[in-house]
A protein has these predicted regions:
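Surface-exposed beta-loop interaction hotspot
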Residues: 148-215
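Bacterial signal peptide processing site
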Residues: 28-31
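Forkhead-associated
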Residues: 68, 73-141
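Mid-length scaffold segments of soluble, non-membrane domains
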Residues: 103-108, 214-257
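N-terminal pre-domain segments of enzymes
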Residues: 33-72
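Extended, aromatic/histidine-rich regions of cofactor-dependent oxidoreductases associated
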Residues: 183, 251-254, 265-267, 274-276, ...
Length: 320
């Protein structure tokens, strides 16, 4: 499983602080205790800051991960959905029309949606007028129901043998009250060149997620790298034509970084098998920002006995 969907002002303020005056970085060993200050290349800092700015912009998009307002598991064959108090055994949403419509599942497991009369909705950006079949997020083009003039979005998820509705809204408190991202100082010593060791074609790796689902994910190979004279390995997920994706934990997990681990991406290796792991770009999964995501967890192979004092720190939400 790859991360669902595979990632302003605060970011730019951080960038100004990083680039102002004498540009200093902190180079640290695996323990993070013996730090020696060194001049850091301004071009490197600018690259890292540009990435951080884009990361923040992606999170704060009207349909970004901070916009999630609901994850509703569908346990019955039929559910009315809406925000009204009289929705009964249906799915009560945090935003939207009091009564939006009816979800129904047939014997094959296919879900259909019938909109409530008089409610203005869209399906994939076009006006929704009648009963439709919904494609879940395992489809290359999942169905998207829009409401509140496009500020709200509903999608169908499939996790193992369970189905759920995910609801997003641009007015989500987690988005409007977002507290900003914090990082360890950008450090070029954490941009590490590793060696890609391919697995036999078709190999998969079981990946669990935060809601208890176990899925077999494409596992093309492992990346071996060194830090402070020690060798480490990270199992990669992904398929040719995409980036390598890593779900990892380290000794900062729960001690500075998000307890359930972080994500990291890297370019697919070339013929020489070299892979650059930039741990400055290790980032939090969506579950660090919302209760309504279904994030993959690090496999045992990717739990590093290493203090990775680089990348994104744990997020402290002002929304409870």
């Amino acid at each position: 499983m790859v991360p669902e969907g595979k990632m302003r002002r605060f970011g730019r303020a951080v960038g100004t602080a990083l680039l102002a005056g004498v540009l200093l970085g902190a180079c640290s060993g695996s323990g993070g205790d013996d730090r020696t200050k060194t001049i850091v290349d301004p071009a490197f800092l600018a690259e890292e800051q540009a990435w951080r700015n884009q990361r923040l912009d992606d999170l704060l998009r009207p349909d970004g991960w901070t916009s999630l307002v609901g994850l509703h598991w569908l346990e019955l064959k039929a559910h009315y959905i809406g925000s009204g108090e009289r929705i009964g055994n249906g799915v009560r949403m945090a935003f939207g029309p009091e009564k939006m419509g009816l979800l129904q599942r047939d014997r094959s497991g296919t879900w259909t949606f019938t909109p409530e009369k008089g409610v203005e909705l869209t399906l994939d950006g076009e006006p929704l007028k009648g009963k439709v079949v919904l494609r879940n997020d395992q489809d290359p083009q999942p169905s998207v129901i829009g409401f509140d003039e496009g500020r709200g979005l509903v999608t169908l998820l499939r996790r193992g043998d369970r189905d759920a509705l995910r609801v997003r809204h641009a007015d989500a408190p987690t988005r409007l009250q977002f507290a900003g991202l914090e990082y360890w100082p950008a450090d070029p010593s954490w941009r590490i060149e590793g060696r890609f060791i391919p697995h036999p074609p078709g190999k998969t790796l079981p990946i669990g997620d935060i809601v208890g689902t176990l899925s077999d994910s494409p596992n093309p190979g492992v990346v071996e790298f060194e830090r402070d004279g020690r060798s480490f390995r990270l199992e990669a997920l992904g398929e040719p034509g995409s980036e390598l994706f890593f779900v990892l934990a380290d000794r900062t997990s729960g001690h500075g970084s998000y307890p359930a681990g972080r994500f990291l991406e890297a370019a697919w290796p070339g013929p020489d098998g070299k892979v650059v792991l930039d741990f400055n770009r290790a980032y939090n999964p969506p579950c660090a920002f919302t209760l309504f995501a279904t994030c993959p967890l690090p496999p045992p192979e990717n739990r590093l006995d290493l203090l990775v004092t680089a990348g994104e720190k744990n997020y402290v939400s002002p929304v409870h």
